[in-house]
Amino acid sequence: RFANGVLRASDAVYNLPINEAAPYNNHIHGFLHKRAHEVIEHDADNNCAWVKTRYVYDENDEFFSYLPVKFTAEYTFTLSEQGLELNVRFTNNSDVMLPMSLASHTTINAPFVDGGKEEDIRLTVPISKKCELNDRCLPTERLKSLTMYDLEYKNGAKCPVLQVCDNDMYVGETGELDGDNFHGVIAEDAASGKKLCYEVSDEYKFWIIWNDRGMNHYFCPEPMTAMIDAPNLSLERDVTGYTEVKPGDTFETHQRFFTKLPAVEE
């Protein structure tokens, strides 16, 4: 979200269309998910299958009048015994700075295990601070200590459905999986012990959790490289996560879904 559609970069101010109506009056979600991306490569072998897509953003895109910064977006999806991996690359093709605040509206079905029950789902999100949001779902710039409600995420006790999780936004940190460092979230079916693990690269510094009022059989642990409205905040960039890509440079992130099954006793 960008308040009032304004995006303040270091070298320009862009006015994006407001597509989140009053009382919010924000620009939300961007436009890339509404574009047809070209498949430029696909193949499969005994180890994996992959597909690579590309979208070239330039003056031919109707959004260019709002954000006249040329770039290329490339997505590579790889499916193997290591899980489902997504590599994202944004290359700045312009002669000005490319504002970068990347997020995924990741959605997980509930239940996610055959025969599972929604009430058995537990979500672990490694977090350190709560990012307070106002009534327009914009940061107040206050980072708050975790309450008992918030600690349910950190301690793996949060059921992310059957109750409202409405834009719970946090500063992320590195957690643990099987004794190793793990930068991501873990959804577990407590009845079976089966885990769905969602690993993200270190560029993703924040998490926001949303579940569409909790009764629609899905939940969204959404990784973000920057806070909501990050370029417009007065906080330092090392706090907000906002960054800019120089002309000719590339910004790259990585995500991976994989499963963990409970150990089988012999």
Regions found by a protein language model. Name each.
Residues 1-8, 236-237, 242:
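Short acidic, Pro/Gly- and aromatic-enriched capping/linker segments at domain boundaries
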Residues 57-62, 66-67, 118-119, 126-136, ...:
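Surface-exposed, gly/pro-biased binding rims or lids
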Residues 8-13, 40-51, 78-83, 112, ...:
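A short, structured loop/turn motif at beta-sheet edges
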Residues 55-106, 111-113:
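Acidic, contiguous internal or C-terminal segments within carbohydrate-active enzymes
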Residues 97, 107-201:
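Active-site/ligand-binding surface loops and adjacent short beta/alpha elements
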Residues 18-81:
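Extended, loop-rich substrate-binding clefts of extracytoplasmic carbohydrate-active enzymes
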Residues 194-266:
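Active-site pocket scaffolds in enzymes
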